[in-house]
Amino acid sequence: MTVKIYDTPEVQDFLKIVAGLDQEGGNDRGKQIIHRILSDLYRTIDDFDITAEQYWSAVSLLNALGQASQFGLLSPGLGFDHYMDMRMDAADAEAKRTGGTPRTIEGPLYVAGAPEAEGFARMDDDPDTDGETMWLHGQVRDTAGKPIPGAKVEIWHCNSKGGYSFFDKSQTPYNLRRTIIADNEGYYRARSVIPSGYGVPEGAPTDQVLKLLGRHGERPAHIHYFISAPGHQHLTTQINLAGDPYTYDDFAFATRQDLAAEGKRVENHPAAQQYGVEGTVTEVIFNIELSPTAEEELQARP
């Protein structure tokens, strides 16, 4: 069947009715957005001669994504999260807001309310016999290189098995999640465990979509950050650990050139020992630059 009816007056009038454009109530912007989305989908059905069977198969997949709470997982896989970053980068460039550590995607696994500590935090509440001890630290400064005392550094990551607290019910709440207030020189420090990379669940709805596209669903080992300070632009970012096979092949498109960090094995690290962290550690250093701004809305999480 090669029927094409999208451009007919009947279909165009029908689209306006479906989107509520003939009604006085509702939200005008919402109507325009729905009209655009429906128009593009209707045209796609025409252009690719999508059958009723194929349509209902897609509906079943959407239902499965919802039941598995995987829309937040598929979103970065289809590039939506990175596209939003690209738009924010373009807005910064247009406003001549330059410099600072690059942003990258937040991901769906942030949980507010992590315990707060001054200068140093131990993040690993749960034993992780397979995990390497991580000594994670860095300095928060402005684009002129001046330290930012009191900067708020929120950090979260998975354990050595790829699970996140709250989502992996075997973990203590807020395991591997902390908020650290940088010291008078802008430094933050944490003891934790080296996270592992992980993939989307085999056979899950997200995996089905990615396989349809001939793509994998793997993420490298990575660590998430929110960083904020008065008078500076809020930063959402993450670092991928160098040496992971997917460091530069992240299905979520989160890798950026300046956001890969090396892990270095150190015996009896002197600075770590000052905070009670003994033995062999894997040191990961991530220094952060925040861009100055007087706009209050840019100082908060987008």
From Swiss-Prot:
Cofactor list: Fe(3+)
Pathway the protein takes part in: Aromatic compound metabolism; beta-ketoadipate pathway; 5-oxo-4,5-dihydro-2-furylacetate from catechol: step 1/3
Keywords associated with the record: Aromatic hydrocarbons catabolism, Dioxygenase, Iron, Metal-binding, Oxidoreductase, Plasmid
Any single Pfam family the record assigns to this protein: Dioxygenase_N
Enzyme Commission number, as recorded: 1.13.11.1
Class of enzymatic activity (EC top level): oxidoreductase
Catalytic activity: catechol + O2 = cis,cis-muconate + 2 H(+)
Record GO biological process: beta-ketoadipate pathway; catechol-containing compound catabolic process
Superkingdom field: Bacteria
Record's signal peptide: none
Binding positions for Fe cation per the UniProt entry: 164, 198, 222, 224
Any one Gene Ontology molecular-function term assigned to this protein's record: catechol 1,2-dioxygenase activity
PANTHER family: DIOXYGENASE, PUTATIVE (AFU_ORTHOLOGUE AFUA_2G02910)-RELATED, INTRADIOL RING-CLEAVAGE DIOXYGENASES DOMAIN-CONTAINING PROTEIN-RELATED
NCBIfam families (alphabetical): catechol_proteo
Similarity remark: Belongs to the intradiol ring-cleavage dioxygenase family.
Name of the protein in its database record: Catechol 1,2-dioxygenase
